[in-house]
Each structure stands twice: as structure tokens, then as C-alpha cells.
């Protein structure tokens, strides 16, 4: 069994990670570290876990664990790893932004299996992608692979309230979020950098703009993204490119039907739909921001790192009705 630990166990992504790992056939959840919830049962915070586990939040860290997931606030993972040294055998999966951009001062691999599967299999350190970055990158990556990303990409995406985390703020409060809709961080969202990095990895001469408008939706979870760019070929040409690129992808699927968040919420899937309007290709992408956009993808990466079947523990059912 893989001995797993979680650092920072009280948030939404940690909660989803706990749920997956508790039912993963090859994993034993060894510890969940949280100083703010020390001594409390996991189900006192993640209340749906009552009856599933008696594990308590702890301040003790097993530095010999096989894999450790970091569910810390952005900017805290670097400091945590500098203060805590793990065994050489321990694999690290970081769910923050801290290591997503390539740099000479770290050896983290960007953990997008559809892009870097072989590197992930051989990695000891994984930087898990962001939720918006996952939905948007999947929508456009096949174009970059074929050197066709030569014009500006325009993206409009809506995320559920869980994308903002558990900390309260004026824009996450129920009375403001309910029956409301708003844009934020237009053209300057932090995920733009990693999206551009992925495009450039496959199309080195990529210099066109990514015009991204993120929106807050009045629902709990999920991301619905629409992206469009110029495409000179026919719709069938685009479908062939996308089908070829994702033919071996464990969780990414193409459809000709209208997409709905309910098809993917509570799953690790990404669904894509292609449409052609004049000289523009429109790609719709839907994911669960907490699963394919965070914890599910993290476990998918873990499976690859340990040589397990990629979908193990992740055959999850959508809450369709």
C-alpha cells in the first residue's frame, strides 16, 4: 500500500483529496496535517466523512511517507518544503501555484497528464495545474500541437464558488454570490502564465495573446469555458486533430452535443465540444474545478508516478440529477 499524507487538510481541495484517497484501493491515508484543526476528527470539518474514517487532524508529519500532497495556500508550499525535509523516496504533489512555472531553482514537473505523461511517470515532484488552466489548456492544446495557434485566443470561463476556497470574503458570501454574476481579474488572472507556458511547450513560436475573462457563477462547483480562435480548416479537420491528440487520454472526451456542468461535476472528466462559425473555431470545455481542476488530477498524477492504472480510484459518478 502507498502511505499517503496531506499537508493542509481543512480546505475544499483537501476534502476532495481525503474522499478519494480513503477509497483508493492502493492507498492508506497515513496522516492529515492541520495546525488550525489539530485534534479534531476529519468529519468535524468534512462532515460527509462521518462513518468513513476516525482519523484526526494532526501536527505530526510522517517524513517517510510514500507521497505527500500539499494543499496549502498559494505561496506557502515553498516555505513549507524549505522548513521540512522528507525522505528521498517521498514523492510530492503540490496543489498551489508555487512551482507551476518552470525555473532553475526547482525540479517540479507540471502535472498535466495529457501534456506531460511520460515526465510525470518519472517525476518525484509534481506541480498540479490550476483549475482554469486545466479547462482552458485542454480546449486549445491540440491546436498548439499542430502549430496552428497563430492568432489571438479569446476565452470566457465561469467557475463555481468553491474555486475561491473556504476563506470568507464579500464576493464568496451566500447573500452576494446567490442570484448574482460577475467578472474578475480580466486579462490578468494568475493562471494565464501557466496556460501560455503549456502552449509554448508544444508550439515554440507561439506569441499570440490569450484574452481571458474569468467569471464568478452562482453555483458551487464546476468550470464552463468557451474559447475561440481563427481556424482555416473545416470542422471535420479540427475534430480529427482533437481526436488524435486525446485518443489515449483517460478522462478527456469529445462530443457533438451541448455541454452541461452536470455531466462532469463530481467526476475527473473533461468534456470538449467543437463548433465552427465562419473562420472561427469555438471550443467549449467543462470540468469539475475541485476534481479534474485540483484533487482528482492530483491523484491521477500519483497513479502515474507509482505505475498504477491511471483511472484507479477515480471512476467517479456525476451528480446528474
From Swiss-Prot:
Keywords: Amino-acid biosynthesis, Arginine biosynthesis, Cytoplasm, NADP, Oxidoreductase. The keyword Amino-acid biosynthesis applies. It is an enzyme of class 1 (oxidoreductase). The active site is at residue 131. SMART domains: Semialdhyde_dh. It catalyses: N-acetyl-L-glutamate 5-semialdehyde + phosphate + NADP(+) = N-acetyl-L-glutamyl 5-phosphate + NADPH + H(+). Its main location: cytoplasm. The keyword Mitochondrion does not apply. Pathway: Amino-acid biosynthesis; L-arginine biosynthesis; N(2)-acetyl-L-ornithine from L-glutamate: step 3/4. GO terms for biological process: L-arginine biosynthetic process. It comes from the Bacteria. It is found in: Cytoplasm. Its EC number is 1.2.1.38. GO terms for cellular component: cytoplasm. Belongs to the NAGSA dehydrogenase family. Type 1 subfamily. Catalyzes the NADPH-dependent reduction of N-acetyl-5-glutamyl phosphate to yield N-acetyl-L-glutamate 5-semialdehyde. HAMAP family: ArgC_type1. This is N-acetyl-gamma-glutamyl-phosphate reductase. It comes from Christiangramia forsetii (strain DSM 17595 / CGMCC 1.15422 / KT0803).
Amino acid at each position: 500500500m502507498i502511505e499517503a499524507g496531506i499537508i493542509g487538510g481543512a480546505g475544499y481541495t483537501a476534502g476532495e483529496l481525503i474522499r478519494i484517497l480513503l477509497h483508493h484501493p492502493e492507498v492508506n491515508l497515513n496522516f492529515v496535517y492541520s495546525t488550525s484543526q489539530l485534534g479534531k476528527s476529519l468529519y468535524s470539518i468534512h462532515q460527509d466523512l462521518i462513518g468513513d474514517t476516525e482519523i484526526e487532524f494532526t501536527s505530526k508529519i510522517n517524513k517517510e511517507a510514500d507521497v505527500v500532497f500539499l494543499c496549502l495556500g498559494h505561496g506557502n508550499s515553498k516555505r513549507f518544503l524549505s522548513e521540512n525535509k522528507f525522505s528521498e523516496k517521498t514523492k510530492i504533489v503540490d496543489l498551489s501555484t508555487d512551482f507551476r512555472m518552470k525555473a532553475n531553482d526547482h525540479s517540479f514537473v507540471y502535472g498535466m497528464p495529457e501534456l506531460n505523461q511520460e515526465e510525470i511517470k518519472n517525476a518525484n515532484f509534481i506541480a498540479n495545474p490550476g483549475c482554469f488552466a486545466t479547462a482552458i489548456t485542454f480546449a486549445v492544446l491540440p491546436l498548439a500541437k499542430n502549430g496552428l495557434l497563430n492568432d489571438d485566443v479569446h476565452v470566457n470561463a465561469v467557475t463555481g464558488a468553491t474555486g475561491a476556497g473556504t476563506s470568507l470574503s464579500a464576493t464568496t458570501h451566500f447573500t452576494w454570490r446567490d442570484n448574482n454574476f460577475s467578472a474578475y481579474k480580466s486579462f490578468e488572472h494568475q493562471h494565464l502564465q501557466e496556460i501560455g507556458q503549456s502552449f509554448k511547450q508544444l508550439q515554440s513560436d507561439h506569441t499570440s495573446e490569450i484574452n481571458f475573462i474569468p467569471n464568478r457563477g452562482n453555483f458551487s462547483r464546476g468550470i464552463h469555458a468557451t474559447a475561440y480562435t481563427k481556424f482555416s480548416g473545416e470542422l471535420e479537420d479540427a475534430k480529427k486533430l482533437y481526436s488524435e491528440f486525446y485518443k489515449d487520454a483517460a478522462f478527456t472526451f469529445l462530443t457533438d452535443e451541448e455541454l452541461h456542468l452536470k455531466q462532469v461535476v463530481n467526476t475527473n472528466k473533461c468534456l470538449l465540444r467543437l463548433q465552427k462559425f465562419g473562420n472561427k473555431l469555438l471550443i467549449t470545455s467543462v470540468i469539475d474545478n475541485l476534481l479534474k481542476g485540483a484533487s482528482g488530477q492530483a491523484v491521477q498524477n500519483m497513479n502515474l508516478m507509482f505505475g498504477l492504472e491511471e483511472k484507479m480510484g477515480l471512476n467517479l459518478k456525476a451528480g446528474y440529477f
